[in-house]
């Protein structure tokens, strides 16, 4: 027993070790927070979906893998080593993500995308267009300078290639040998004699850069087919760095405020909760940084929110300990029983949230995949490490006489049982009024799907001085032959000016068109426009994203109904599952109407918010159901269903409010910081999330329980009628 006093010191050493490891890392194998791999929305970069061009049939797996290898080699040649190249075998696409070369001011992301998709097949042809030698016959290519001090590309052929080249030059003596890159003629020298030795050179290079690009293409090899993209996103590193600084600030503020609240309210258990939270955050950082998982802005938001939700487990435990102390138990007994009786609620809540996050990972992509990953790892770490560590430390601390006193704990006071079920009609009416108001307001404003789901193009540029939107609109329309909307915006916090160009229709945009637009609006303007962000998406990509989003939400609902039916069979199973889902639908509609009221286009942020609210709200409802089940299974319990719900809701009310406060606090900090820093994407994510969290707390307290009572009482009345008929 005395040895347990040492556990707190062991735990503190372990926590300090992992916190230091998370901050500083250890060598090349364990990277810390400073070496985390950030997504293109943070550090700037390019994301493009390449699809085969001109193929009559779907490319095979082997062809796609071959194309990926070529793209990887081309990225190597450009020294872009930190990238992701993913094959979507089902869709027949290749998805490429790589960072913006922030150290190169002249880096052109559109040109980079265009070059990646070029087939780049080198061919040596005769005057009749007969192909004699191909790029695959070349073993090596390099840039050199000839005797006239001109840049050339030297070629070395394979053994088979050398023979083919010798045979071709022998046949074409006195004629020109035309050298093509794809269908572009790059050189047409006259063959004077048969060339042996397996070497040749390509002349006519205008510069070293042109020669190097040609050499890189030859060395990389040709794609098995040409690829094109009208689906891509780019973001400048300047915009990304501002977003990273803002989210880091939000994380610091949210964690500090959460810890201050926990210590002020729960005292000693609150201190233990903060230490546990530091341990969990350190583990989560390592889970992201060690495997170099790409973290995006929504991923950081998920990290902050998972930290806020992790506090929930400690709140449940602390509230249980307070109840045990109120019963007259000793501190040690209260702590022991508190953890024991809180475990089922913690387990059920974490399982449902983990499954929802897993669904988002499976069906989501890009930034939302990152959000799902951080949320899922946060939940798993909370369940496996967080709860255990807090119990380990608290059980050790109370072995010291100084802390084995009730003054270090918050003791619950007797509370009057609140009659939630008697006022259920008012709760239901309030919800109906809110939902109807939201429906009407959203209908007036009009719900709008983002280009992410519908397809389309949005171009964002930064500039200084003044911008003639009318002139720019006409210039861009002449380039793309589509209706164009041009708007200007100014970030009140930074003073940065933005030009936003939206192209009508649901077509994407080629990199060549994007370059032409930028050149056109810069031509003749004293104010130079610089690309900040581009988004070009084809309708079929958007339709796929919308379909996956709908599937994710439906699967989440189905899982919740099945899980609650199994876990809470004592509460009618199906009744508890269906009423929980109705409460969730209430919250989702609130979120949807927030999108409509504030004219926020519905995109994957809506999906992430919805799934987060599902995980949070169902967790709240499960805590209530768990308490109802506990009372209903009591041997001496003779309370009515309404009394059971009123007692259980009153007992869990403080926990619900405190959990809502900590999570809403985190979301509110994210919202405020995003508004101050002008991060529209995060604002459009955090505002609906904030509303959904508040709605989730309300629905779990005022809707789920009373609705379950109404269902069960209605079922009993039907059963009595049937029994009465049989008696007659």
Q: Predicted segment positions?
A:
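A structural signal for conserved, well-ordered secondary-structure elements
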Residues: 1-728
């Amino acid at each position: 027993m005395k040895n347990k006093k040492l556990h707190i010191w062991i735990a503190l050493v372990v926590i300090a070790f992992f916190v230091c490891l998370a901050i500083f890392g250890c060598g090349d194998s364990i990277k810390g927070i400073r070496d985390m791999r950030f997504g293109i929305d943070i550090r700037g970069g390019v994301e493009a979906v390449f699809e085969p061009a001109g193929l009559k049939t779907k490319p095979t797996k082997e062809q796609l893998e071959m194309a990926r290898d070529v793209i990887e080699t081309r990225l190597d040649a450009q020294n872009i080593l930190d990238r992701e190249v993913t094959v979507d075998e089902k869709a027949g696409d290749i998805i490429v993500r790589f960072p913006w070369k922030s150290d190169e001011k002249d880096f052109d992301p559109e040109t980079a995308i265009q070059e990646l998709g070029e087939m780049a097949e080198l061919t040596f042809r005769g005057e009749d267009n007969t192909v004699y030698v191909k790029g695959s016959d070349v073993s090596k290519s390099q840039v050199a300078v000839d005797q006239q001090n001109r840049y050339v590309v030297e070629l070395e052929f394979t053994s088979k290639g050398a023979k083919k080249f010798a045979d071709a030059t022998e046949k074409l003596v006195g004629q020109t040998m035309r050298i093509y890159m794809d269908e572009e003629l790059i050189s047409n020298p006259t063959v004077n004699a048969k060339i042996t030795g397996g070497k040749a050179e390509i002349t006519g290079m205008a510069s070293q850069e042109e020669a190097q690009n040609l050499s890189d293409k030859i060395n990389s090899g040709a794609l098995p087919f040409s690829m094109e993209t009208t689906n891509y996103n780019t973001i400048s590193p300047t915009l990304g760095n501002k977003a990273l600084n803002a989210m880091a600030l939000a994380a610091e503020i949210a964690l500090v405020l959460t810890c201050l609240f926990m210590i002020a309210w729960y005292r000693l258990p609150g201190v233990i909760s903060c230490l546990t939270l530091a341990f969990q955050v350190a583990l989560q950082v390592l889970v992201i940084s060690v495997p170099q998982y790409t973290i995006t802005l929504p991923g950081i938001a998920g990290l902050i929110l998972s930290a806020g939700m992790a506090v929930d487990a400690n709140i449940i435990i602390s509230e249980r300990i307070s109840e045990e102390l109120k019963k007259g138990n000793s501190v040690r007994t209260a702590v022991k029983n508190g953890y024991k009786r809180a475990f089922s609620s913690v387990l059920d809540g974490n399982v449902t949230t983990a499954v929802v996050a897993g669904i988002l990972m499976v069906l989501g992509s890009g930034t939302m995949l990152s959000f799902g990953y951080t949320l899922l790892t946060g939940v798993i770490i909370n369940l496996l490490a967080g709860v255990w560590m807090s119990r380990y430390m608290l059980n050790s601390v109370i072995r010291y006489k100084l802390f084995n006193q009730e003054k270090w704990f918050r003791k619950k006071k007797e509370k009057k049982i609140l009659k939630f079920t008697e006022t259920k009609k008012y709760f239901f009416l309030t919800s109906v009024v809110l939902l109807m108001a939201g429906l009407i307001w959203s209908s007036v404003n009009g719900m709008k799907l983002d280009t992410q789901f519908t397809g389309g193009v949005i171009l964002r540029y930064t500039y200084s001085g003044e911008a003639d939107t009318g002139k720019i609109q006409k210039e861009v329309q002449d380039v793309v032959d589509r209706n164009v909307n041009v708007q200007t915006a100014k970030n009140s916090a930074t003073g940065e000016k933005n030009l936003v160009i939206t192209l009508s229709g649901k077509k994407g945009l080629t990199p060549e068109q994007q370059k032409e637009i930028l050149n056109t609006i810069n031509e003749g303007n004293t104010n130079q426009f610089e690309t900040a962000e581009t988004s070009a998406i084809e309708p079929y990509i958007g339709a796929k994203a919308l379909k996956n989003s709908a599937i994710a939400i439906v699967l989440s609902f189905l899982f919740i109904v099945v899980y609650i039916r199994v876990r809470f069979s004592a509460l009618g199973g199906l009744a508890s599952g269906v009423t929980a889902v109705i409460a969730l639908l209430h919250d989702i509609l609130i979120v949807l109407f927030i999108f409509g009221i504030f004219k926020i286009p519905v995109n994957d942020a809506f999906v992430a918010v919805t799934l987060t609210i599902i995980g949070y709200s169902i967790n709240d409802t499960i805590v209530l159901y768990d308490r109802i089940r506990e009372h209903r299974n009591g041997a001496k319990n003779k309370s009515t269903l309404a009394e059971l719900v009123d007692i259980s809701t009153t007992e869990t009310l403080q926990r619900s409010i405190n959990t809502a406060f900590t999570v809403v606090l985190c979301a509110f900090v994210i919202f405020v910081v995003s508004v101050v820093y002008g991060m529209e994407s995060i604002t459009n994510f955090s505002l609906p999330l904030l509303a959904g969290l508040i709605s989730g707390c309300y629905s779990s307290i005022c809707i789920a329980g009373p609705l379950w009572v109404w269902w069960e009482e209605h079922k009993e009345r039907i059963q009595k009628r049937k029994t009465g008929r049989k008696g007659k």
